[in-house]
């Protein structure tokens, strides 16, 4: 996963930094002091709630073409990320478990 959250002091999600989009800065140490997290972050394509059902998660990933999306609680606090890879792995496991019953 190459996406990292940017939060405030209360853990509210402000944005994300996608390392694949800032490679030019990462490999040039002389630029490190010239940028802040606020300058490098961007709004994620969507935010998911911990209350969102899997159907909403899958639809949101399809609609936004995102492989990684942040998850927040009902106060807007960052909880974690969900990835398409993890989602599909969980789905496959459910299908295996279901077929064994």
Q: What is the role of each PLM region?
A:
Residues 5-7, 16:
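Short, conserved beta-strand edge motifs with alternating hydrophobic and charged residues
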Residues 13-67, 74-101:
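Tandem CBS (Bateman) regulatory domains
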Residues 1-3, 66-68:
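Short loop/turn microsegments at loop-to-beta-strand junctions
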Residues 7-8, 72-73:
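Core beta-strand residues in small-molecule sensory/regulatory alpha/beta domains
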